[in-house]
């Protein structure tokens, strides 16, 4: 992709980052970031050499004010903008038809608002879940591209194609869809055409794209175990810009190395030295003659994990250094394999996010944004970590006095963790004489802490510190959510009913489920449930 410079148009690889709409402690619709936040973040992006920032929706005026101020002050290395526009997803999912007036008209209104925002020529009234204010900062000179849409829901795509079957291909002034295009593809072409018409009316033309992801990619994946992850396709090769739109059109994808499962079950990928790169080359080959950008990629940090990926590129359980190294490797893959750019997900941790294997236990869901769950991987993608840095750990109140070599126990907490400070008679004594701390979290007993003769029978969670520098978190077996959710309810994991009796006296280590049993049809093979221990700390 090329961008205008003082010397004319110049092609380059665009390395950038995605920026969300809010800050920890807030839901996305609250768009809580301030001008000071944006000033700091954009300056830090510039220091890192970020060439592009992608946003998903309209942000507060202060974002565009900060971006324009930075770019005016750095004409030799401005940060370009990819502006996203969300589809009215609730209306689309409820109607199952992108052509429904509530969806199409609502999306056009969002696009029109976004165009006015980018050109600094609109005022948006207050509306729940949306940014508002007076937009007077024109950032159009630094607009690299428009990216409209969302990660398309498979069922709603399939429903749209069924309900609108027989629709002719779209023929607009600026964008068209090919003969044989699906109704969903033609609808996307019409929305791109509408976006282009608004920009053309202002005398502008720039690259346009729509959001896509591996679930609706145009390739066939017979080794994908979940039918819904390969049920429908949306193919950017069926959409084209006309000569009336010199800004052009490109394909874009959210592409992660750990999901869907075809990335590690397809022999062509699984047996390769770098499965992610082989997939990227297959996808790039399909889009021959068309520019393609990876607009989301990355791996999260934290102690939780939600899915396994080839080469250890799992969805979680990485240190900051490990994640950074993997992200850098993938960015090199993206560049080497002929893509126009790669946008890392994401700039800042987002606490409101959820992960499939923990969200049932994060109750009430509307309070998820108020605290950080170390086991929820979607909260840990940020290039900038949004954590409390353990400041509360240094204080706390005394909750237990002298006992068995421990002088006192202090407890404190913050939005991240519960902190315990144990003061020992002999510093480091736990390395040779392990200490067990019990917690009474819920009603009921479990016959005493593990490794004791009935000490603290009310405890249902135990933390064993030592020997050495290891630690082990244990839970009463009858409180194990995995056993109840995936053993009793679904029979995905083995379990002993006697252990699940309240007060059974059995202890086990907390686990997360990473995959349910999966059938790979070409192999006629069922892969068993995948679990990971999250209670052992070496």
Predicted regions: what is each one?
Residues 1-72:
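Active-site-adjacent substrate/metal-binding segments within catalytic domains
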Residues 27-45, 226-242, 321-333:
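Short, acidic/polar
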Residues 32, 54-65, 215-219, 225, ...:
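Acidic-and-aromatic substrate-binding clefts and catalytic sites of carbohydrate-active enzymes
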Residues 88-89, 93, 97-99, 113-182, ...:
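Active-site groove signature of glycoside hydrolases
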Residues 102, 106, 159-186, 304-319:
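A solvent-exposed, charged loop/short amphipathic helix patch at secondary-structure junctions
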Residues 203, 221-311:
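Glycoside hydrolase catalytic-domain groove-lining segments
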Residues 309-312, 322, 333-414:
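Aromatic-rich peripheral "rim/lid" segments of glycoside hydrolase catalytic domains that contact
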Residues 389-538:
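Surface-exposed extracytoplasmic segments
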């Amino acid at each position: 992709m090329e961008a205008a410079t003082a010397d004319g148009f110049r092609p380059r690889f665009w390395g950038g980052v995605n920026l969300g709409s809010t800050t920890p402690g807030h839901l996305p619709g609250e768009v809580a970031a301030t001008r000071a936040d944006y000033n700091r973040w954009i300056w830090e992006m510039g220091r890192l050499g970020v060439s592009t920032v992608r946003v998903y929706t309209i942000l507060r005026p202060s974002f565009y004010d900060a971006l324009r101020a930075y770019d005016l002050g750095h004409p030799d290395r401005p940060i370009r903008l990819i502006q996203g526009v969300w589809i009215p997803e609730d209306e689309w999912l409820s109607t199952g038809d992108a052509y429904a007036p509530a969806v199409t008209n609502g999306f056009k209104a969002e696009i029109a608002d976004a165009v006015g925002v980018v050109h600094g020529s609109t005022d948006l009234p207050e509306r729940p879940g949306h940014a508002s204010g007076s937009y007077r900062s024109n950032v159009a000179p630094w607009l690299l591209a428009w990216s409209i849409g969302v990660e398309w829901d498979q069922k709603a795509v399939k429903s749209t194609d069924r309900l609108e079957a027989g629709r002719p291909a779209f023929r607009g002034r600026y964008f068209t869809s090919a003969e044989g295009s699906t109704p969903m593809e033609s609808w996307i072409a019409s929305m791109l055409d509408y976006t282009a018409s608004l920009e053309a009316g202002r005398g502008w033309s720039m690259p346009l794209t729509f959001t896509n992801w591996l679930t609706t990619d145009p390739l066939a994946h017979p080794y994908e175990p979940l039918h819904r992850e390969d049920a429908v396709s949306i193919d950017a090769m069926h959409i084209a810009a006309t000569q009336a739109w010199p800004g052009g059109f490109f394909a874009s994808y959210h592409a992660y190395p750990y999901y869907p499962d075809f990335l590690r079950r397809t022999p062509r990928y699984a047996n390769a030295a770098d499965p992610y790169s082989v997939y990227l080359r297959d996808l790039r080959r399909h889009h021959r003659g068309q520019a393609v950008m990876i607009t989301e990629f990355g791996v999260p940090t934290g102690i939780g994990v939600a899915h396994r990926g080839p080469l250890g590129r799992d969805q979680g359980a990485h240190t900051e250094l490990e994640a950074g190294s993997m992200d850098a490797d993938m960015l090199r893959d993206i560049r080497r394999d002929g893509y126009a750019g790669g946008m890392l997900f994401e700039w800042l941790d987002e606490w409101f996010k959820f992960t499939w294997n923990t969200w049932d236990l994060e109750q009430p869901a509307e309070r998820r944004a108020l605290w950080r769950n170390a086991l929820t991987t979607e909260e840990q993608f940020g290039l900038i970590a949004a954590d409390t840095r353990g400041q509360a750990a240094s204080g706390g109140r005394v909750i237990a006095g002298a006992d068995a070599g421990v002088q006192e126990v202090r407890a404190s907490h913050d939005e991240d963790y519960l902190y315990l400070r144990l003061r020992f008679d002999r510093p480091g004594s736990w390395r040779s004489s392990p200490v067990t701390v019990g917690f009474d979290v819920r009603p009921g007993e479990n016959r005493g802490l593990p490794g004791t003769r009935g000490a603290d029978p009310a405890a249902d969670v135990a933390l064993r510190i030592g020997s050495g520098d290891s630690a082990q978190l244990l839970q009463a077996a009858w409180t194990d959510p995995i056993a109840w959710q995936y053993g009793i309810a679904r029979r995905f994991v083995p379990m002993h009913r006697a252990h699940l009796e309240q007060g059974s006296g059995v202890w086990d280590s907390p686990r997360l489920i990473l995959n349910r049993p999966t059938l790979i049809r070409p192999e006629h093979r069922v892969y068993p449930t995948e679990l990971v221990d999250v209670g052992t700390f070496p």
